[in-house]
Amino acid sequence: MAKAKFQRTKPHVNIGTIGHVDHGKTTLTAAITKVLHDKFPDLNETKAFDQIDNAPEERQRGITINIAHVEYQTDKRHYAHVDAPGHADYIKNMITGAAQMDGAILVVAATDGPMPQTREHVLLARQVGVPYILVALNKADAVDDEELLELVEMEVRELLAAQEFDEDAPVVRVSALKALEGDAKWVASVEELMNAVDESIPDPVRETDKPFLMPVEDVFTITGRGTVVTGRVERGVINVNEEVEIVGIRPSTTKTTVTGVEMFRKLLDQGQAGDNVGLLLRGVKREDVERGQVVTKPGTTTPHTEFEGQVYILSKDEGGRHTPFFNNYRPQFYFRTTDVTGVVTLPEGTEMVMPGDNTNISVKLIQPVAMDEGLRFAIREGGRTVGAGRVTKIIK
């Protein structure tokens, strides 16, 4: 059968399955691919449980994560779905942003109700900015007592509300295993779940619709034309003759105008999110710009030196530190394209952080960095990655 062409016509949405180990995240992922394949055979491939469970290793910011990616389509949307089988993999994925989610399906076994990892996953989803969560109450075939199902549903709603997620989110009773076996009643439950995903997870804001930002990777001079900065456009669109600001690393912000946009040595009218471009800047000297700064739409990005972050510290086996660190630890924080040294303050009551831990820290950088909440970073010691994190709150 011919492969269905990737149509740009449908909105593309990134989702994932989260929840306690053994509650059926991977089985549900497999069931979704099978049910959608049977419903729309020309749009979807079916993926067996073991294809998803033996998730390939990926490296993100120097950290190895096991994570499975599957794709599928409904009538309305094209989905990229991630499933991190292990608890540690889930935590690492959320913090490093190996796979960002526009929404998540929280899988809770009706037989157990919310468990410690269920809570931890929802908390982490809040901290890393997952916009929406809905619920698959799995293994519902194994619970005959309607009151018990309602009780579990209530507990899950309280858990969502506690982390400021929508407590009226859809909670769909499913049996992933029975759906995989082709049981008509439970196949219908997975179809109902996917309808709920279509309806409840909001369309993501496309990167091109956000204000322009490009991290500077390189700076050079073209004789007779001026200074060019190169990098990959992170978000937004830049047109020739638009004003920009150069932000970060230095104490003051520089204003200038983009007089040319080049890509693959060709002149363009504009560059957009995802493009690797060179920007010609009017009246800017070679020494006025450096790697680590960002070129951005005026007034949309500010430099900061103090922030709070959620971090994952690599274990010794992952190539991380062999020893814990304490208050006033001074590593480098790698933001986008450059390292900046910072001083770490641990949360009250935390004496030290062990390799393999995830925790909140406060950081004071020695140079300002253009940042927003949600920006990701690596923690390095002399170029070696020892951790990864995400800005959860800007202090100054």
UniProtKB/Swiss-Prot annotation:
Residue span of region G5: 175-177
Keyword Cytoplasm belongs to the record: yes
Signal peptide limits: none
Region G4, annotated ranges: 138-141
Region (G1): 19-26
Source species, domain of life: Bacteria
InterPro entries associated with the record: EF-Tu_GTP-bd, EF-Tu_GTPase, EFTu-like_2, EFTU_2, G_TR_CS, P-loop_NTPase, Small_GTP-bd, T_Tr_GTP-bd_dom
UniProt-recorded Gene Ontology molecular function terms: GTP binding; GTPase activity; translation elongation factor activity; zymogen binding
Residues in tr-type G domain copies: 10-205
Coiled-coil ranges (or none): none
Catalyzed reactions per annotation: GTP + H2O = GDP + phosphate + H(+)
Region (G3) location: 83-86
Keywords recorded for this protein, A-Z: Cytoplasm, Elongation factor, GTP-binding, Hydrolase, Magnesium, Metal-binding, Nucleotide-binding, Protein biosynthesis
EC number: 3.6.5.3
Record: residues binding GTP: 19-26, 83-87, 138-141
GO annotation, biological process: response to hypoxia; response to iron ion; translational elongation
NCBIfam families per record: EF-Tu (TIGR00485), PRK00049.1 (NF000766), PRK12735.1 (NF009372), PRK12736.1 (NF009373), small_GTP (TIGR00231)
Protein name listed in UniProt: Elongation factor Tu
Taxonomic lineage: Bacteria, Bacillati, Actinomycetota, Actinomycetes, Mycobacteriales
